[in-house]
Amino acid sequence: MNRQTSLPEQRQLLIRVSDSNYDENTKLVVTTFYTSSEDANNNNATSSYHNISTHFVNITPDDVCKFFDENPTQSIIFAKGAEPIRHVLIPLFVSNERYVPHQIHQYYDIQHLYYKGGVEDENQMEEEDVDVAAEDDVAIARAIMEMSEETQCVSSSGVSSLLIFESLYFGSQIWVQLSKKIRKESFSPPPPPPLACLHGHPSPYIPVALCQPPSMGVKELPLDGMASIFSNYQPRKKIRAKFILSIFRPNFWSVLNKKANGKIRKKPFLCSSAEAMDFVSANAVIVRMRGLPYDCTDTQIRAFFEPLKLTEKILFITRTDGRPTGNCDAFVQFETEEDAQQGLLKHRQVIGQRYIELFKSTAAEVQQVVKRCNLINSAPVVANAVEVSDEKKKDCVRLRGLPYEATVQHIVNFLGDFANMVKFQGVHMVYNNQGNPSGEAFIQMISEQAAAATASGVHNNFMCVGKKKRYIEVFQSSAEELNLQHLVHQQQQPQAAPQALGFLAHLPPPAPGAQQIWTSYPSPPISPILPGQVTQLIIYGIHLSIGVPELVANFTTPDHTVENSFEVQEVMFTRWPTHLCPGEAILTLRSRAVPTQTAQTSPLSQISQISAYSHHHHPTGLPPNFPLQPILME
């Protein structure tokens, strides 16, 4: 059927990709034809045929730009689907740092001219890898010229779908919204060419209507980061599997499981306070693993330690956003000390392409690492100090940066008018496992509103203790870490034996001036100075690369030893080193002349026993649930 063309004096560009791989070696069949005014009034098909020239070219951005520059308003693109434009033309411009012509943003879809039999015939041809011959482009060009203006409908997958698809694949910050807003962190596209300039939208969330065909969107997104990507453009199922799924790939902080049905599940390694509590509650030997691959699984870890048997619990440590800590990757547990020693012999063996460092660890270190990685609320309250109805209720505040000489009265003066909203016996000083002040305190307020007002009212205010003037950081907190602190403390602190209490009963009473003065805001007693064969050192300026093994090796001499085992902890970091601030640690030196079994572990056990005896005989009496031992803290 010969018909007068509705587009006289227009240069038209027909683009068809010769294969479905869309790689850098892709060749294009470019058919150019020019329709003159005389041809428009001529119904002879032969004359239209002779005005069509077909040739193979390896298209370049300069050629396309020249084509559009010569015909800025009358250039029309006919394409066999949107894929040649999405996967060839636009990446071609971006990779060569050229602007994308605005004419590319609209095109005419002429797939139906290639496949008269419908979608089923196209599927069959794609499965058989049948390509359309170049000679067919001449017939397609003639068919385009014979198309009426009514049938030249712009494809529904025009500007929006083209830019969205390319932006998603090439990694710009544009995301799809179906029924809810989606966090950018839920996805991890591969490193992009700079295609973000196409949409130029500053917002991280962009509402987008799904397009047909092809349509693409997020079907569902639960809180665990699972999403289903679907496309109803069945003729391009191979391209969909290659390109749509490629935008979700394993990166440095997540593991993606790609399934055949298009569902993609992201499983970041996260840790909560409940998991940490459950982990340290087991009576097992803990080993720390450092340097794990970013996509390491528990199966690989168990295979690494074979034939040794691990417990069922493996604790992976990451930050709340899924990024690895860069310092400690996982904790594992062995049932016996012998298995742990055999497992440590695998130090610096490899998993995949990375060598793994192994260190013996403790429950206290697990708690410190979890706290340092902000995986639980950084506001531990004194364990079992008061009855807590809701651990997640943020009715506490945490004070950090206190002078070591600070007392409860200093804290009360620091709070000022906010001290009226402190619960009875609600100020709790925090001590490390050597019984020394850690520079932190936790305060229970009467309500969440009071805690929020206190945190915002006195945050970064200065506290003066003697000649020292330090600013104090104040954060709103909850009691969620309460049980974890108490559990770790119970494992590290030796319980007072009945015979020890009987011995203490014959001790002379302390001097009146040395007795603990209990105020309305009592706090665990400060460690007294007791004679013994232990010497404690405070080490400042610890570099980021220095750990517990290096400190133990550096301070071990023929006359002194530093023991850091599962039973005895004599190296304790009070501040972990970072890139911005050096670390601090407290180290306990022992004389080799004193046997280990008779040596004084620390003044901590004596403090607990004396405090319990004094509390029992105190005339005023205290609530039975008030802790009378220092809190274990980093």
Swiss-Prot record:
SMART domains: RRM
Any single GO BP term: RNA splicing
One Gene Ontology molecular-function label: mRNA binding
Keyword annotations from UniProtKB, A to Z: mRNA processing, mRNA splicing, Nucleus, Repeat, RNA-binding
Chief localization: nucleus
InterPro entries (UniProt xref): ESRP (IPR050666), Nucleotide-bd_a/b_plait_sf (IPR012677), RBD_domain_sf (IPR035979), RRM_dom (IPR000504)
Subcellular location field: Nucleus
Domain RRM: 285-363, 395-479
GO-annotated cellular components: nucleoplasm; ribonucleoprotein complex
Signal peptide bounds: none
Top-level taxonomic group: Eukaryota
Family annotation (Gene3D superfamilies): 3.30.70.330
Protein function: mRNA splicing factor that regulates alternative splicing of many genes in embryo. Probably plays a role in the formation of embryo-specific isoforms.
Family the entry assigns: Belongs to the ESRP family.
PANTHER family xrefs: HETEROGENEOUS NUCLEAR RIBONUCLEOPROTEIN-RELATED
Protein's recorded name: RNA-binding protein sym-2
Organism the protein comes from: Caenorhabditis briggsae
Name of the encoding gene: sym-2
